[in-house]
Amino acid sequence: SASRERGAGFEEAIAKHEGINVVAKQPANFDRTQGLDVATNLLQAHPDVKAIFAENDEMALGALEALGDRAGTEVIVVGFDGTTEGLSAVEDGRMLATIAQQPEELGARAVEEAAKLLRGEDAEAEVPVEVVTVSSDNVADYQ
């Protein structure tokens, strides 16, 4: 699933960097309110946390609520999906980045594969589409 792949990608990237200590991992079921609750508990248990990675923007936005004024200054937050609210949070500096999917490319590739099937050709079982890190440097390109 996308959730497992996002989590595995996070683990793989973290393993490449010494000195990063992951203090907690907890699901929030891709829900903003649960993201708020999880982040609140995390901050109570680990008040010196420096960063929060959420597997979607909804959970990241919940973490931003829990952080209040600390968001983007004392604690960096990264979300995933490139949603409208996630992009706004990046633009105003509360969120460091969101990992944006490319829905136009996903749709185009899906149509290409469906057309192959309609012609009786073999279609790819999986068609990877690159994601894009959206930060303050390029957020204007995605709004």
Label each residue range with its predicted role:
Residues A2, E12-K16, Q102-Q143:
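Hinge/cleft segment of the Venus flytrap/periplasmic-binding protein
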Residues R6-G7, A60, L87, G107-V111:
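A general structural signal for well-ordered alpha-helical segments in protein cores
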Residues F10, A24, A28-S88:
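Hydrophobic alpha-helical
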Residues A13-H17, N41-A45, A66-R70, A89, ...:
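Structured segments of extracytoplasmic/periplasmic soluble domains
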Residues G19-V22:
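A generic structural motif
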Residues K25, D92-E104:
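Short beta-strand elements at the ligand-binding edges of bilobed clamshell
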Residues D81-L96, A140-Q143:
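Flexible loop/hinge segments that line or gate small-molecule binding clefts
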